């Protein structure tokens, strides 16, 4: 039997929103396999589909800037929200974005080695800022995009940099449309541009979970297939940008809105500060442990 730790129970709770003891039981039944435990809870109707990147824990800010040909979205982390609101920190983030936009390095490692206008490397520039600001600071990630003449970048920053989105539309130069799409992505967080981008493996996996879910609900086998077909279609529309109701006008889809301008979404990047990074929460672990031992 797998050793089910308090940390595992905590992680499953965060990913599914299910109760503590339900999570413990799911992990026991699946011998500690986190992904199978998520499916177990969903099949029992206890949890909804988990988004693997939902765990937001660190501080900092995102930033998006562009010029006529290129755009960059990046995330810089700090230890506290207080520092993230500090003018010096925000100036550092802006300087790093301008540096990456100008140099367009291939990797994070390359970016840290590039030379700033003042002669310092990016790494030394960050190290100096750490000394001044008094907190650990790191350039976590970035993406650079390039566009053609008949294209448009959309930039949107939400909650003072908590979320940063960069979109690229082809077939239109309407930056307002591109920004509207970026705003939608910030709010709804789609996984894909279109349902055609969803892998066969993901579709089949979701179909299996939905089938078991319907059977566990006691539905007759002869109607399960139609139920699964309808639920799968709904699932695909929920994770695909083009199929989603547009936040500024729910009567049309995002795909239809973009088509009105003659364009098409070809890529998007959505960064949320700290997604996938977990803070240490000893008190919560102790609380869980006390329940697990009962």
Swiss-Prot record:
The record's section on CDD domains has: UBA_EF-Ts
Regions that span the bilayer: none
SUPFAM superfamilies per the UniProt record, alphabetical? Elongation factor Ts (EF-Ts), dimerisation domain (SSF54713), UBA-like (SSF46934)
Which GO-annotated molecular functions does the record name?
Answer: translation elongation factor activity
- Cite the InterPro entries for this sequence: EF-Ts_dimer_sf, Transl_elong_EFTs/EF1B, Transl_elong_EFTs/EF1B_dimer, Transl_elong_Ts_CS, UBA-like_sf
Pfam families the record matches: EF_TS
Q: What is its main location?
A: cytoplasm
Region Involved in Mg(2+) ion dislocation from EF-Tu: what ranges? 80-83
The question of whether Protein biosynthesis is a record keyword is answered with yes
**Mind listing the UniProt keywords for this protein, alphabetically?**
Cytoplasm, Elongation factor, Protein biosynthesis
Q: Name one GO cellular component term.
A: cytoplasm
NCBIfam families linked to this entry: tsf
- According to its UniProt entry, what is the function of this protein? Associates with the EF-Tu.GDP complex and induces the exchange of GDP to GTP. It remains bound to the aminoacyl-tRNA.EF-Tu.GTP complex up to the GTP hydrolysis stage on the ribosome.
Protein family (similarity comment): Belongs to the EF-Ts family.
| Matches recorded under HAMAP family | EF_Ts
Q: What is this protein called?
A: Elongation factor Ts
Q: Which organism is it from?
A: Listeria monocytogenes serotype 4a (strain HCC23)
């Amino acid at each position: 039997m797998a050793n089910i730790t308090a940390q595992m129970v905590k992680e499953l709770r965060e990913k599914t929103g299910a109760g503590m003891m339900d999570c413990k039981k799911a992990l026991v039944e699946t011998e500690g396999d986190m992904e199978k435990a998520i499916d177990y809870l969903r099949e029992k109707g206890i949890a909804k589909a988990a988004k693997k990147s939902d765990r937001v824990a660190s501080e900092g800010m995102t930033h998006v800037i562009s010029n006529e040909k290129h755009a960059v979205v990046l995330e810089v982390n700090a230890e506290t929200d207080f520092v993230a609101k500090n003018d010096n920190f925000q100036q550092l983030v802006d300087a790093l974005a301008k540096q990456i936009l100008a140099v367009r390095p291939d990797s994070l490692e390359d970016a840290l080695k590039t030379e700033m206008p003042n002669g310092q490397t990016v790494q030394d520039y960050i190290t100096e800022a750490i000394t001044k600001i008094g907190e650990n600071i790191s350039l976590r990630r970035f993406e650079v995009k390039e566009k053609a003449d008949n294209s448009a970048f959309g930039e949107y920053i939400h909650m003072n940099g908590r979320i940063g989105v960069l979109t690229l539309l082809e077939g239109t130069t309407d930056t307002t449309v591109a920004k509207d799409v970026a705003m939608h992505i910030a709010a709804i967080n789609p996984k894909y541009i279109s349902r055609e981008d969803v892998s066969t493996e993901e579709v089949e996996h979701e179909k299996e979970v939905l089938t078991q879910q319907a059977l566990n609900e006691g539905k007759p086998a002869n109607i399960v297939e139609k139920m699964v077909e309808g639920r799968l279609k709904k699932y695909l529309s929920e994770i695909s940008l083009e199929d989603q109701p547009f936040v500024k006008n729910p009567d049309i889809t995002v795909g239809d809105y973009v088509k009105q301008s003659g364009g098409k979404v070809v890529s998007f990047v959505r960064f949320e500060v700290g997604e996938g990074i977990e803070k240490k929460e000893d008190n919560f672990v102790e609380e869980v442990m006390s329940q697990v031992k009962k």
